[in-house]
Amino acid sequence: MPSFDIVSEIDMHEVRNAVENAQRELTSRWDFRNVNASFELNEKSESIKIASESDFQVNQLVDIMREKLAKRGIDGAALNIPDDMLHSGKTYSVDATLKQGIDTPTAKKIVKLIKDSKLKVQAQIQGEQVRVTGKARDDLQSVMALVRGAELGQPFQFTNFRD
């Protein structure tokens, strides 16, 4: 029976490249001259600290970071940015976390979405991924389109496609 896995993974090497590119752009932009602004990647906690002297500049830096991630093939929805900014001294900062892996509530939403579609496939949660099996390859491709079109707040990849 054909099957595939729905996963949510981020290549940390590409994230590191995107952070370095964003830092490089930051040094060359005239509106950030003589401004204490930075991007810091923490690979262990999978987060990016974005800091600057004003909240408006932090929002600009977030846009730069999303643009650089998109150029490196990482969906901007993978970057989770909190609404509140940390303010200490004369610096505003934000700790943006990278969403990786499918948590249980999201996996349950995916399974429910697939079951509600009435396609002849089975979906089962396996840790941080969802395995979908079915008799027809066309049904599996319909499930892929369904999951891509669903707004679940996280980018998904489809791996391990077997016939």
From Swiss-Prot:
Gene Ontology cellular-component annotations: cytosol
KW Nucleotide-binding (keyword) present: yes
Pfam families the record matches: DUF520
Keywords: Nucleotide-binding
GO function terms (MF aspect): nucleotide binding
InterPro entries: DUF520 (IPR007551), UPF0234-like_C (IPR035571), UPF0234_N (IPR035570), YajQ-like_sf (IPR036183)
UniProt record similarity statement: Belongs to the YajQ family.
Protein name in the entry: Nucleotide-binding protein plu3881
Source species of the chain: Photorhabdus laumondii subsp. laumondii (strain DSM 15139 / CIP 105565 / TT01) (Photorhabdus luminescens subsp. laumondii)
Lineage: Bacteria, Pseudomonadati, Pseudomonadota, Gammaproteobacteria, Enterobacterales
